[in-house]
């Protein structure tokens, strides 16, 4: 297989997933596709175009949390506002690791949106 074919074959690789125990219940998180990540990064901005850290946490969980068939469990990130921070935080940390977001990338997203100073 040539390099071009080998590269494009990677697109058919299944997205990785992991299971996380929260309050005695096991939940499945799936890594983001590039399309999901791009869509989510646009949705992270508030009405004025500023990066919203709280929205980022909830969106990452929304896009990653799936049922046994691989379908998203949460329809709208705002549904997560009622959850305890410890639960969203536990899921969020696992999502960061799974989709390879790190604090530097999150700060860069904030800078690009104009919120953070640099």
Residue spans of the language-model regions?
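Short, surface-exposed, charged amphipathic helix/loop patches that serve as local interaction elements
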Residues: 14-15, 22-118
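Extended acidic low-complexity intrinsically disordered regions
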Residues: 1-14
């Amino acid at each position: 297989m040539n390099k071009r074919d080998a590269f494009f074959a990677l697109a058919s690789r299944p997205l990785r997933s992991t299971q996380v125990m929260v309050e005695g219940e096991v939940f499945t998180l799936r890594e983001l596709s590039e399309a999901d990540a791009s869509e989510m990064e646009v949705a992270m901005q508030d009405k004025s175009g500023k990066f919203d850290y709280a929205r980022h946490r909830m969106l990452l969980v929304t896009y990653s949390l799936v049922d046994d068939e691989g379908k998203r469990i949460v329809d709208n990130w705002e549904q997560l506002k009622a959850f305890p921070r410890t639960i969203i935080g536990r899921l969020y940390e696992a999502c960061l690791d799974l989709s390879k977001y790190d604090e530097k990338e999150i700060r860069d997203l904030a800078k690009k949106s104009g919120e953070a100073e640099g």
